[in-house]
Amino acid sequence: IPSYSLANEKKQNLQNIYTLLQEKKFEEGIKNLQVLSEQNDINAQLLYSKILFSGDLTPQDFENSYFWGFSALLGGKKKASNILEKLNEYLNEEQIRDITTKLREFLEKRAYEKDKRAIVQIAKIYENFTEPPDLINAYTWYNIAVAQGIKTAKSKRDEVLNSLNEKDLLDAQSLSIKLFKKINN
């Protein structure tokens, strides 16, 4: 399937969800929204995060709202940062760390299912959302992203590469090769 038709299909699905919600078929709409979110559709994730935050159509669920909002942010939805800022008032550091771990595991599973966006999202977690930044793993995932044909990851990979020493770089490259094979198996 060409990626264009897949993107078109997701847009269609999101449109169906809006229609279901307008027709007050909330349960079905929310279920479909969850399915699309689990397919790493960042537009669906942002909407789902907002709904879980507001509690208008389903009970409030701040942890899941953070999970989906964070995934959308990592996928490039900058608007998600607004919801995450609000959620920071209700969640403690430990909860956020746990959510980040769960999200990384979710994205790794997606990456092994050949989801290219997930590969970059994982790299961003390691680079920007671990304390201290885990540059070995960030490089590993950016390196895989570039090898998978994601051109936008090249500058990030090279940037992280310049902050690694020789040993760490070799370790990261070995890990990249191993994970790349696992993804493309």
Positions of PLM-derived features:
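Terminal, low-structured helical/coil segments at or just beyond the last alpha-helical repeat
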Residues: 93-113, 152-185
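Hydrophobic face of amphipathic alpha-helices that form TPR/SEL1-like repeat modules
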Residues: 15-19, 47-54, 83-90, 121-128, ...
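Alpha-helical segment of the N-proximal tetratricopeptide repeat
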Residues: 11-39, 113, 118
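Classical Sec-dependent N-terminal signal peptides that target proteins to the secretory pathway
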Residues: 1-7
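Short helix-capping/linker turns of helical repeat alpha-solenoids
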Residues: 24-25, 38-42, 54-56, 75-78, ...
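Structural signature of tandem alpha-helical TPR/SEL1-like repeats
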Residues: 24-28, 59-67, 94-105, 132-137, ...
